[in-house]
From Swiss-Prot, chain B:
Protein name: F-box/SPRY domain-containing protein 1
Pathway named in the protein's UniProt entry: Protein modification; protein ubiquitination
Annotated B30.2/SPRY domain residues: 138-330
GO terms (BP aspect): dauer larval development; determination of adult lifespan; negative regulation of apoptotic process; negative regulation of axon extension; negative regulation of axon regeneration; negative regulation of DNA damage response, signal transduction by p53 class mediator; negative regulation of gene expression; positive regulation of neuromuscular synaptic transmission
Organism: Caenorhabditis elegans
Expressed in which tissues: Expressed in GABAergic neuromuscular junctions (NMJs).
Biased segments, Polar residues type: 15-28, 49-64
UniProt-listed PANTHER family: F-BOX_SPRY DOMAIN-CONTAINING PROTEIN 1, SPRY DOMAIN CONTAINING SOCS BOX PROTEIN
C-alpha cells in the first residue's frame, strides 16, 4: 500500500507542472508561452528544437529573441496561441473554405496598424491558422470596395502622395544639413 | 562631461529645427502637413537613436504627431502599410476576394498590382481550380495555347453560354464545346458568355464534327435569333448578326451574301478540326478570320458600335464546335 502510494505521487507531480518558454520581442518585452501553445508556431517550435531548449532547462535559459516582432504584437500572438493550444496544427495553409470562428473574429477586429503588424508577425512566426484568420478578416473588410476606398481604408498612399513625401523628405534633409553646417 | 553636454545640445537643436520647419510649411500648404509630420517622426527616430538621453524625450514628441494623421486619413507609417505585405500574405488575402474585388485591388497600388500580375501565382491557380470544370483542366489540348492560369480563367468567362443557347444545343462538361443534338429541320446556335465593345479580341473556333449543309461561324448581338425551323444560314440572316458559312465559304449579313471568303478563286474548303481564329477589332469596326494562323483578309467592315458576341449555328446532328477566347491577337 505504501509502495503504491509512493508510486502514485511522482506521477501526479509530473502531471502538475506546465513548462513555459520565455521569448523576447525586439523592444525587450519578455513573454512566457507554454509548451503546448508554442506548437502553433512553426518558427518557435523549430527554434526550441534546434537551440536545445527542453523542459528541464527552460527556466534557466535566456529568452528566445524575436527580432522582427514588437512586444504589443507578440503579446497578441502568444494570447492567440494559448487560446488555441489544444487545436491541431495544420500541415499546410487552409484552403479558401475557411470559417472564421466567433472568438477569432473578435480577436482580429483591431486597429489597422495593429492588424497589419499581427499579419506580419503571424507570417514570420508561421502561425498558419492565425494568419489565415487575419487574411480572411482583411478580405472581408475589402470586399465590395473601389480602389479609392481600398487606399483610404488600408492607408495606402497614391503615387502623387508618395512623390510629395519624397520631395518633402529631401527638403528636410537639406534643411538639416544646412543647420548642421551653421552649428559647426 | 563638457563634451557630453555638447553632444546632447546638437540633437536638441536639430529636433527643434525639425519641429519648427513643418509649422512654416503648414502655413503655405495645408494638404502637405500630415506628410510633413510623418517625415518629422522618421527624422526624430533617426536622430534619437545615437543619443542615450533622447530616447526618453522622443516618445513624448512622437505621441502628439501620431493623432492628426489618423484623423485626416492620410498615409502614415509606410513600413507597416498594407501595400507592403509579403507576397505570400497578399495571395492569402486575395484568394478570399471575388474577381470584381481583385480588379479593384489591382488598381489600388503598385505592389498589389505586381502581386496580381503574376499570371501563374497561387491566387490564379486557386481560382482556376475553383471555376473551371475538371474536364477542361484535364484536357491537354483544349487550352494548350493559353500559357497561364489567368488566361485560362479569362477564357472560361468568355466561353459558350449555357443560358443563351438553342434548346437543341447543349454545352459539354468541359464548358468550351457545344454539341448539337440530332433534331430534324432545325438550325441551332449559341452565343458566348461575354460580349465585347472595345479593343481587339480573338476567339479560336474549331468545328470538331461534320459541317452538314450549314455551318456558320461569326458574331451576333444580344438580339440575334439562335434558333429557326429548317436548315438555314441563320447567322447573318438579319441585321443583328454576321456569319461565314464554312460549307460554301459565303459571307452573310442582313440576309445578303457578301461574296466568297477568302476572296479568291476556288477558296479551299474547311477541313474538320482546322482552327479558325475570329478577330473582332471594335476600334476600327472590322472583323476577320485566320485559318491555322493564316490571315484570310477583312471579312466584315463598318460594323456598328454594338456589344458583339462570338456565335455559331449548326444543323448537323451530333456535330460539335469548340470556342476558346485568347485575348488580343499578336500582331505580325
Amino acid at each position: 500500500m505504501s509502495a503504491e502510494a509512493v508510486a502514485a505521487a511522482p506521477i501526479a507531480e509530473e502531471a502538475t507542472p506546465v513548462v513555459y518558454y520565455s521569448i523576447e520581442s525586439n523592444d525587450r518585452v519578455v513573454l512566457k508561452i507554454s509548451e503546448q501553445a508554442i506548437k502553433q508556431s512553426a518558427t518557435l517550435s523549430n527554434s526550441i528544437t534546434n537551440l536545445g531548449y527542453s523542459a528541464e532547462n527552460a527556466e534557466s535559459m535566456v529568452p528566445i529573441p524575436i527580432e522582427k516582432v514588437n512586444g504589443k504584437t507578440l503579446k497578441l500572438v502568444v494570447e492567440w496561441c494559448e487560446h488555441h493550444k489544444a487545436d491541431p496544427v495544420p500541415e499546410a495553409y487552409p484552403s479558401g473554405n475557411t470559417v472564421l470562428p466567433v472568438w477569432d473574429r473578435k480577436f482580429v477586429d483591431i486597429e489597422h496598424d495593429a492588424l497589419t503588424d499581427l499579419v506580419n508577425a503571424s507570417n514570420f512566426l508561421e502561425v498558419m491558422t492565425l494568419l489565415t484568420y487575419c487574411c480572411k478578416f482583411i478580405a472581408g473588410l475589402a470586399k465590395g470596395m473601389s480602389p479609392e476606398e481600398m487606399r483610404v481604408f488600408f492607408c495606402i498612399p497614391t503615387d502623387e502622395e508618395d512623390e510629395k513625401a519624397e520631395r518633402f523628405g529631401k527638403e528636410k534633409t537639406e534643411a538639416s544639413a544646412t543647420s548642421a553646417d551653421t552649428t559647426a | 562631461m563638457a563634451e557630453n553636454d555638447g553632444e546632447t545640445i546638437v540633437p536638441d537643436e536639430q529636433c527643434n529645427l525639425t519641429a519648427s520647419t513643418p509649422m512654416k510649411s503648414s502655413g503655405l500648404e495645408q494638404v502637405e502637413s500630415p506628410k510633413e509630420r510623418k517625415t518629422s517622426m522618421v527624422e526624430c527616430d533617426d536622430e534619437g537613436n545615437p543619443s542615450s538621453g533622447t530616447p526618453d524625450e522622443s516618445p513624448k514628441q512622437l505621441t502628439p504627431h501620431s493623432i492628426p494623421p489618423r484623423r485626416r486619413r492620410s498615409p502614415r507609417r509606410p513600413e507597416v502599410s498594407a501595400s507592403r505585405l509579403p507576397l505570400k500574405v497578399l495571395n492569402q488575402i486575395f484568394q478570399y476576394l471575388p474577381l470584381k474585388d481583385l480588379r479593384s485591388a489591382m488598381l489600388t497600388c503598385h505592389s498589389w498590382n505586381n502581386a496580381l500580375s503574376m499570371e501563374d501565382s497561387d491566387i490564379w491557380q486557386y481560382l482556376l481550380g475553383k471555376k473551371l470544370p475538371e474536364a477542361a483542366v484535364s484536357d491537354p489540348f483544349l487550352l494548350a495555347e493559353l500559357g497561364s492560369a489567368k488566361k485560362k480563367l479569362r477564357a472560361w468567362y468568355f466561353a459558350w453560354n449555357t443560358s443563351d443557347i438553342s434548346r437543341n444545343n447543349y454545352i459539354r462538361t468541359n464548358g468550351f464545346t457545344v454539341h448539337r443534338q440530332p433534331v430534324a429541320q432545325s438550325t441551332d446556335g449559341v452565343r458566348g458568355k461575354r460580349g465585347i465593345s472595345k479593343g481587339v479580341h480573338a476567339f479560336d473556333i474549331t468545328w470538331d464534327g461534320p459541317l452538314g449543309t450549314v455551318a456558320v461561324v461569326g458574331i451576333a448581338t444580344k438580339h440575334a435569333a439562335l434558333h429557326c425551323v429548317g436548315y438555314v444560314a441563320l447567322l447573318g440572316s438579319d441585321d443583328q448578326s454576321w456569319g461565314w458559312n464554312l460549307v460554301d465559304n459565303v459571307l452573310m449579313h442582313n440576309g445578303a451574301q457578301l461574296g466568297v471568303y477568302p476572296k479568291m478563286n476556288n477558296p479551299p474548303k474547311y477541313e474538320v478540326g482546322d482552327k479558325i481564329r475570329l478577330i473582332i477589332d471594335c476600334d476600327t469596326h472590322v472583323a476577320y478570320f485566320e485559318r491555322n494562323s493564316e490571315f484570310l483578309g477583312i471579312a466584315f467592315n463598318h460594323i456598328p458600335p454594338l456589344r458583339l458576341y462570338p456565335a455559331v449555328c449548326a444543323v448537323y446532328g451530333n456535330t460539335e464546335v469548340t470556342m476558346v477566347y485568347v485575348g488580343s491577337p499578336q500582331m505580325g
